[in-house]
């Protein structure tokens, strides 16, 4: 089953999510929006097993990385904050 991995611009570039991912779905890419000058990216979402370890590892108050599982993807993405 395919999962959707969304990286938000609240990412602080700490690499915690990248290190927590057991299937190497995430990687860091250059980005000028934070002091670390990098942001998480999810180029291999087809390898995501939906364990959400990346979410658990994220130290930001608003989770900067979110994994949406199957049917949850379309339902959750439509919510307004």
UniProtKB/Swiss-Prot annotation:
Domain 4Fe-4S ferredoxin-type, chain residue ranges per copy: 2-31, 39-68
Membrane topology per record: Peripheral membrane protein
Enzyme Commission number(s): 1.97.1.12
Cofactor(s), names only, from the UniProt record: [4Fe-4S] cluster
Keywords: 4Fe-4S, Chloroplast, Electron transport, Iron, Iron-sulfur, Membrane, Metal-binding, Oxidoreductase, Photosynthesis, Photosystem I, Plastid, Repeat, Thylakoid, Transport
GO biological process: photosynthetic electron transport in photosystem I
GO-annotated molecular function: 4 iron, 4 sulfur cluster binding; electron transfer activity; metal ion binding; oxidoreductase activity
Compartment(s): Plastid, Chloroplast thylakoid membrane
Coiled coil: none
Listed InterPro entries: 4Fe4S_Fe-S-bd, 4Fe4S_Fe_S_CS, PSI_iron-sulfur_center, PSI_PsaC
PROSITE patterns given in the database record: 4FE4S_FER_1 (PS00198), 4FE4S_FER_2 (PS51379)
SUPFAM superfamilies for this protein: 4Fe-4S ferredoxins
Cellular component terms per the entry's GO annotation: chloroplast thylakoid membrane; photosystem I
Keyword DNA damage attributed: no
UniProt keyword Chloroplast, yes or no: yes
Binding sites annotated in the UniProt record for [4Fe-4S] cluster 1: 11, 14, 17, 58
Residues holding [4Fe-4S] cluster 2: 21, 48, 51, 54
Cofactor note: Binds 2 [4Fe-4S] clusters. Cluster 2 is most probably the spectroscopically characterized electron acceptor FA and cluster 1 is most probably FB.
Cross-referenced Pfam families: Fer4_7
Purpose: Apoprotein for the two 4Fe-4S centers FA and FB of photosystem I (PSI); essential for photochemical activity. FB is the terminal electron acceptor of PSI, donating electrons to ferredoxin. The C-terminus interacts with PsaA/B/D and helps assemble the protein into the PSI complex. Required for binding of PsaD and PsaE to PSI. PSI is a plastocyanin/cytochrome c6-ferredoxin oxidoreductase, converting photonic excitation into a charge separation, which transfers an electron from the donor P700 chlorophyll pair to the spectroscopically characterized acceptors A0, A1, FX, FA and FB in turn.
Subunit structure: The eukaryotic PSI reaction center is composed of at least 11 subunits.
Name listed for the protein in its UniProt record: Photosystem I iron-sulfur center
Annotated organism of origin: Nephroselmis olivacea (Green alga)
Lineage: Eukaryota, Viridiplantae, Chlorophyta, Nephroselmidophyceae, Nephroselmidales
């Amino acid at each position: 089953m395919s999962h959707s991995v969304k990286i938000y611009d609240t990412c602080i570039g700490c690499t915690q999510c990248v290190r927590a991912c057991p299937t190497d779905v995430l990687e860091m890419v250059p980005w000028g929006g934070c002091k670390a000058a990098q942001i998480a990216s999810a180029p291999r979402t087809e390898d995501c097993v939906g364990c959400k370890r990346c979410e658990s590892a994220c130290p930001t108050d608003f989770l900067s990385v979110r994994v949406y599982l199957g049917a949850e993807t379309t339902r959750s993405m439509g919510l307004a904050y």
